[in-house]
Amino acid sequence: MSEMTPREIVSELNKHIIGQDNAKRSVAIALRNRWRRMQLNEELRHEVTPKNILMIGPTGVGKTEIARRLAKLANAPFIKVEATKFTEVGYVGKEVDSIIRDLTDSAIKMVRVQSIEKNRYRAEEMAEERILDALIPPAKNNWGQAEQQQEPSAARQAFRKKLREGQLDDKEIEINLAAAPMGVEIMAPPGMEEMTSQLQSMFQNLGGQKQKPRKLKIKDAMKLLIEEEAAKLVNPEELKQEAIDAVEQHGIVFIDEIDKICKRGESSGPDVSREGVQRDLLPLVEGCTVSTKHGMVKTDHILFIASGAFQVAKPSDLIPELQGRLPIRVELKALTTEDFERILTEPNASVTVQYKALMATEGVDIEFTESGIKRIAEAAWQVNETTENIGARRLHTVLERLMEDISYDASDLNGQSITIDAEYVSKHLDALVADEDLSRFIL
């Protein structure tokens, strides 16, 4: 679990997301409250439940990006789902309980990686011994069993030294490695994912722990042996329990496009993919127990963050019970021309940095001037105003159009330097931006 303070979390998010300070503060406080809760005594800790968040804002302003970056910072089980993929229980489609099952699966993977990393030092020692056994087979007794020697031989010590110094990396050896499990791919019908994953696990375990001799270079063998030995040191039962605890105490679920499951107008008949899904989400958000293949998971202390554009529907169109379970409302603002300028220059891997790096692979040096950046931002904002407002995503379409000629001819421009200023941008984009019909279809 992350121990970062709210200020540190916001500072980290600022490296990738421009503006939206209120949303950043809310998720930073929610993330820090997970840590604060774990410092309480057990009785009080059980009573403190997370305050779920509803993020409201037009498309392309950073809602999903906040979720993506939060997943990396959280160091906790995290899953992002689309609300539109689910249907009410009993109908064809995924049911909402699969959110918790997927969250538990991601926690199992996360805890396994952590356990393997924890045991890496011991695994490296054991892998080294297996490679030395392949290079200098130990003496055998009358029954064909390897004899245990009190002291390693001088030859073994000499090979160990060479192995650690990397002198034997390219030497080929034959070692026995665990055979890869039998791959059985089963296409799951909607709503049957849990059963098919259990069938796959059963088929994979049929092969047992067979070993297969393989010829490999020592450096490649070392990597595979370390993974194999580290996996042996992991206790599957402890791993499952640790993963379930991590989900129950620190799990975070991000539900995107929640506005798309609002009921629209008067409609007769069952609303299985809208209001029905909202009703199914209620027990998950409120707290219930979900059965997974790894064990029972309680959702009482899982943090839910929902987001939606709410351009057609309003937050009040959600059923009242669900509104009450999302007490913290955060409104994200539409982006301005100044925001677009900052998006093009400030983030760590901004779009302009990416284009410069891509063209540098062909030996072309691209330079974006301040006037050029400003003109690109103005063009993107103008197209958003006259057609559909898709937020910062418009910058990608505008830049792709602007860079089309350079990208196409890059291999012939090796060693050249190209400056993208206001004049260059106007020459390539003004006609498209001015003509609403063209910009609607091209930009």
From Swiss-Prot:
Q: Which InterPro entries match?
A: AAA+_ATPase (IPR003593), ATP-dep_Clp_protease_ClpX (IPR050052), ATPase_AAA_core (IPR003959), Clp_ATPase_C (IPR019489), HslU (IPR004491), P-loop_NTPase (IPR027417)
The answer to whether the entry has keyword Cell inner membrane is: no
| Family matches, as SUPFAM superfamilies | P-loop containing nucleoside triphosphate hydrolases
Predominant place of localization? cytoplasm
* Superkingdom of origin organism: Bacteria
Which parts of the sequence bind ATP? Answer: I18, G60, V61, G62, K63, T64, E65, D256, E321, R393
Kindly list the biological process annotations in GO that this record carries: protein unfolding; proteolysis involved in protein catabolic process
One GO cellular component this record assigns the protein to is: HslUV protease complex
Name the keywords, alphabetized: ATP-binding, Chaperone, Cytoplasm, Nucleotide-binding
Its quaternary organisation is: A double ring-shaped homohexamer of HslV is capped on each side by a ring-shaped HslU homohexamer. The assembly of the HslU/HslV complex is dependent on binding of ATP.
Q: Which family does it belong to?
A: Belongs to the ClpX chaperone family. HslU subfamily.
Q: What does this protein do?
A: ATPase subunit of a proteasome-like degradation complex; this subunit has chaperone activity. The binding of ATP and its subsequent hydrolysis by HslU are essential for unfolding of protein substrates subsequently hydrolyzed by HslV. HslU recognizes the N-terminal part of its protein substrates and unfolds these before they are guided to HslV for hydrolysis.
Q: Which HAMAP family does the record cross-reference, listed alphabetically? A: HslU
| Name of the protein in question | ATP-dependent protease ATPase subunit HslU
